[in-house]
A protein has these predicted regions:
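Phosphate/NTP-binding elements of NTP-utilizing enzymes
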Residues: 2-4, 9-18, 26-237
């Protein structure tokens, strides 16, 4: 692709973005939700299955949560409009996310929003994924959404009432990196090595070369009132 074609492609995407009240741009909701999960039974080889599991995980937080992260207690109601946990996932599958969400206790609110959602945002959407989504017919605008919502180098701050509770949330995230074999199989490039910081209060997944110099973790945990000077995050939960 020539430089002129690349520039035209960028201009085409920018024209289709919506503009918020403060001038920020975001991918339209219709594009974000305009995906179709790929049936695994269409795959003929283990490599194809792995690619499809990855692709479905990028597209759908509920899929990642139930199929990859093993959240078997989430609602399995096939009527998506009545499936509570599917709808909870859809709530945060949007560009320009700034939501305050109130849900009664014991409905897996922390599981969806403080465990599954942060990991979903930290999935590694790169050139290989871009090429795959293009090859199966997704638009440049949908790929823009994927690039905006997933980043191997993302910095997420998780806040709880106390640091003790925040660390408990962190332990649930770290458990997937340390003990979820299926998650490890699908996304080996983000699994931490001995070089990455991995403590109770800061979890650094393996990053790209350009992201390794960041002081903030992929997932940093704090309690209310903790100092945040000189810290910079992409997402706060």
């Amino acid at each position: 692709m020539s430089q002129r074609e690349i520039e035209q492609k960028v201009r085409d995407v920018l024209r289709t973005l919506e503009v918020g009240e403060t001038g920020d741009t975001f991918v339209p909701r219709s594009t974000v939700l305009g995906y179709n999960l790929i049936p695994i039974d269409l795959c003929k080889t283990p490599a194809e299955k792995k690619q499809v599991y990855r692709a479905n995980s990028f597209m759908d937080l509920y899929y990642l949560s139930t199929v990859v992260m093993g959240k078997s207690r989430f609602s399995k109601n096939p009527d998506k409009a009545s499936n509570l946990h599917y709808q909870m996932c859809l709530t945060v599958m949007k560009d320009g996310l700034k939501e305050g969400i109130e849900i009664p206790r014991d409905h897996f609110k922390s599981t969806v929003y403080s465990e599954c959602f942060p990991i979903w945002r930290a999935l590694p959407f790169g050139k290989r994924e871009e090429d795959f989504f293009t090859s199966v017919g997704y638009s440049d605008l949908y790929i823009e959404w994927m690039q905006r919502t997933h980043s191997q180098d993302i910095r997420i701050l998780l806040v709880s009432e106390t640091i003790t509770n925040a660390i408990k949330l962190g332990s649930r995230i770290s458990n997937h990196y340390e003990n979820n074999a299926f998650f490890n199989h699908l996304f080996p490039e983000i699994m931490p090595t001995s070089k990455e910081t991995w403590t109770n209060e800061s979890l650094h997944q393996r990053r790209t070369a350009s992201g390794r110099g960041q002081g903030e973790g992929t997932f940093d945990l704090i309690g209310v009132g903790a100092a945040l000077q000189s810290r910079h995050y992409n997402v706060v939960v």
